[in-house]
Amino acid sequence: MRRTKAEAAETREAILLAAEQVFLERGVNQSTLTEIACYAGVTRGAIYFHFEDKLDIFQSIIGRARFPQEEIMLQAARFDHPNPLHILEQSIVAALELFATDERQQVVFTIINQRCEYVGEMAPVIDRLKEMRSDVLALFIGLLKVAERRGELASEWSAETAAQILLAMVGGFLNEWLHGEKGFDLIIHGSRVISTVIQSLRAPANIPQ
């Protein structure tokens, strides 16, 4: 009997969920398709029906995950907003809030940053991660250039430098929170720090009283 599309989709989902757990526990490089198949309760043949190899599985996990960076991109897409620094701050805080409540994001972020060595068969993943970072950086720069044109960005800052610092801070916060076993309130502390940094980016005449 032929499998329905729904059944095939369920099997594919089960494989991806299993892979996430195996990668989290064993590390991507050390994990095998046999382990993933066993965890998912399927055969290796079922895995090869949906994926070419382990790299394809990992790329699929990255591709379907909703990352904080993508949340920022969705919320801050309007470069013509009259208050770009406010939009940028809101977007970053929204990303932190989403991450703090989404265990799936946390698992995938942990795998990407702590459970994979990007050598050998995993080397191609670097290009995808670089592309993601470049997209977010370009978005940040776009918003900050609007602030610059409006005279809202302090003269000692360039849009590029400010964007790089903000992006590094977001990644650093997420890493520190996970490394520290969530020992602090990501939303409260993150929001305060981001607000302080955004304030430091404002030209004196544009700092809210």
From Swiss-Prot:
Is-annotated flag, keyword Nucleus? no
- Mind telling me which InterPro entries this protein's record contains? DNA-bd_HTH_TetR-type_CS (IPR023772), Homeodomain-like_sf (IPR009057), HTH-type_TetR-like_transc_reg (IPR050109), HTH_TetR (IPR001647), Tet_transcr_reg_TetR-rel_C_sf (IPR036271), Tscrpt_reg_MAATS_C (IPR013572)
Domain HTH tetR-type: start-end pairs: 9-69
Q: Which domain of life is it from?
A: Bacteria
PROSITE patterns given for it? Answer: HTH_TETR_1 (PS01081), HTH_TETR_2 (PS50977)
- Which terms are listed as keywords in the entry? DNA-binding, Repressor, Transcription, Transcription regulation
Which Pfam families does the entry link to?
TetR_C_2, TetR_N
Q: Which Gene3D superfamilies match?
A: Tetracycline Repressor, domain 2
Residue ranges of the annotated DNA-binding region, renumbered to this chain: 32-51
| GO MF term list | DNA-binding transcription factor activity; transcription cis-regulatory region binding
Keyword Coiled coil listed? The answer is: no
Q: What does this protein do?
A: Represses expression of bepDE.
Q: What's this protein's name? A: HTH-type transcriptional repressor BepR
Name the species this protein comes from. Brucella suis biovar 1 (strain 1330)
Its ancestry begins with: Bacteria, Pseudomonadati, Pseudomonadota, Alphaproteobacteria, Hyphomicrobiales
